[in-house]
A protein has these predicted regions:
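Peripheral, non-AAA+ core regions of ATP-driven protein-machinery
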Residues: 12-34, 38-217
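Short, flexible loop/turn motifs enriched in small residues
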Residues: 7-11
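Short, small-residue-biased leader/transition segments that mark boundaries at the very start
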Residues: 1-5
Length: 217
């Protein structure tokens, strides 16, 4: 599971399940008519990313369900697409994600993080919730690096960041983001197209290899 921040500044919990199948990435919100077209497009992009990264020598034999938990008034926009992809990678690799860090940011098929709107409101909204519950130095927000120039945060947030009670992580790729969220290297392919053992991408690929073998039976 992973936390994203909605346009209102309120966090929303996203859960992801992955298992053997051929349906690809299933957007539960879309299945029940709670997903806008922009959000649905963002979910389709995730399959493109997974296919290019992991399915060069094996078929992408995967079913994955993505759900905004306890959200019943609809979802639109693509600012949660990177969050959904982190959830997919976490589920496939079985490496847990830090639940104290909220995420916002769009992603393209190449894994590049793209800017979003309302970055200040999103950070300040999540900060207020963390402050009410008690800041302990583990809380923070991950944003697209392009949005750094848009930051005009209130004094409370700035002071908390200075005192290492709250953190803002600016990332440009999915690989950078998953390392912040898990504390584990993402893993780059070597010249033979293999991921380093123990990395997030290695473990995700190994899981997908198992799925592919099951689908062959």
């Amino acid at each position: 599971r992973q936390m994203c921040i909605r346009d209102s500044g309120k966090p929303a919990k996203i859960t992801v399940n992955t298992y053997t199948g051929k349906q690809g990435v299933v957007n539960i919100e879309r299945e029940v008519d709670l997903s806008g077209s922009t959000h649905s497009k963002g979910v389709y992009i995730l399959s493109g990313y997974l296919g290019e990264l992991f399915a060069q020598d094996i078929p992408l034999c995967l079913t994955a369900s993505i759900c905004f938990e306890q959200l019943y008034n609809g979802v639109d926009g693509d600012s949660a697409s990177s969050t959904e992809l982190y959830g997919l990678l976490s589920s496939l690799s079985e490496i847990p994600i830090k639940q104290s860090i909220a995420v916002t940011g769009s992603v393209n098929q190449k894994g590049q993080i793209q800017p979003i709107g309302g970055v200040n409101e999103k950070i300040e909204g999540y900060f207020q919730i963390c402050k009410m519950r008690g800041l302990d130095g583990s809380h923070g927000v991950m944003i697209p690096v392009q949005n750094v120039e848009n930051l005009q945060l209130n004094d409370d947030v700035v002071e908390a960041v200075k005192n290492n009670l709250f953190h803002i992580y600016a990332v440009s790729t999915i690989d950078e983001g998953i390392e912040v969220l898990t504390g584990v290297p993402a893993g780059k392919k070597d010249k033979d197209g293999k991921f380093p053992a123990g990395t997030v991408n290695y473990l995700a690929y190994e899981k997908l290899k198992k799925y592919a073998k099951i689908c062959e039976k």
